């Protein structure tokens, strides 16, 4: 399997390059089971968050759960929120929004219980994700926060994939390119001529 060496938070991980379409491949960044990476990324994201004024952290199920838990642990936060991919029997009167993700086929939904929504109401929420790519999941979380009556204080991720690195409304630790079928890095719209040559 082709891999890509990802340098982030002072560590290096070889990401498997996985097929999305015939000529569009992505590097699979998985934090599950990697305690060292999770701790390091949480530490560095909290450094980026120091200038932000927020009350709570929120992420979407599931890959970012270890990350947001570690961020809460390191910062001493007693509460954070997880937008779930399905309603649970213990969720009173849940609210929901649609979510489209590059790594998930079709349309899915994100849910918050009314109890969590009531805590978010009137509060400033920092949205956290492992990877921001098309921005579909990010937009869904923003909509969920607004639906609960909160405001988005900031948006951050470990990696910004593809053109997401050009967004000026997110904070991230490192850019992650996308790839062609042969493993070469795809050309970004804003690459310099020197960068293009290095990828050929």
Regions inferred by a protein language model and the residue ranges of each:
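Residue-level preference for short coil/turn positions at secondary-structure junctions
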Residues: 53, 76, 120-122, 166
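PRPP-dependent phosphoribosyltransferase catalytic core
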Residues: 3-5, 139-200
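Short, glycine/charge-rich flexible loops or terminal/linker lids adjacent to PRPP-binding catalytic cores
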Residues: 78-125, 190-193, 197-198
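Conserved G/P- and acidic residue-centered "switch" motifs that form tight phosphate/ATP-binding loops
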Residues: 130, 135
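Conserved acidic residues
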Residues: 55, 123, 153
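Conserved PRPP/pyrophosphate-binding segment of the phosphoribosyltransferase/PRPP-pathway fold
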Residues: 39-105
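Conserved SAM/SAH-binding loop-helix junction
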Residues: 66, 136, 140
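Active-site-facing substrate-recognition patch
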Residues: 1-54
């Amino acid at each position: 399997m082709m891999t890509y060496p990802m340098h982030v938070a002072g560590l290096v991980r070889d990401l498997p390059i996985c097929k999305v379409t015939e000529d569009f491949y992505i590097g699979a960044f998985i934090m599950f089971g990697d305690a060292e990476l999770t701790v390091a990324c949480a530490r560095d994201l909290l450094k980026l968050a120091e200038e932000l004024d927020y009350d709570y952290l929120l992420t979407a199920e599931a890959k970012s759960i270890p990350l947001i838990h570690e961020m809460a642990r390191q910062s001493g936060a007693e509460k954070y929120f997880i937008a779930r991919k399905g309603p649970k029997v213990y969720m009173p009167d849940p609210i929901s929004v649609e979510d489209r993700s590059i790594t998930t086929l079709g349309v899915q939904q994100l849910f918050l219980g009314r109890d969590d929504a009531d805590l978010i109401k009137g509060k400033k929420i920092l949205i956290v994700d492992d990877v921001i790519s098309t921005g579909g999941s990010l937009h869904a979380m923003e909509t969920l926060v607004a639906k609960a009556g909160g405001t988005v204080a900031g948006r951050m991720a470990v990696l910004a994939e593809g053109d997401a690195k050009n967004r000026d409304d997110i904070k991230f630790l490192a850019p992650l390119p996308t790839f062609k079928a042969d493993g070469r890095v795809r050309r970004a719209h804003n690459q310099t001529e020197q960068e293009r040559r290095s990828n050929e």
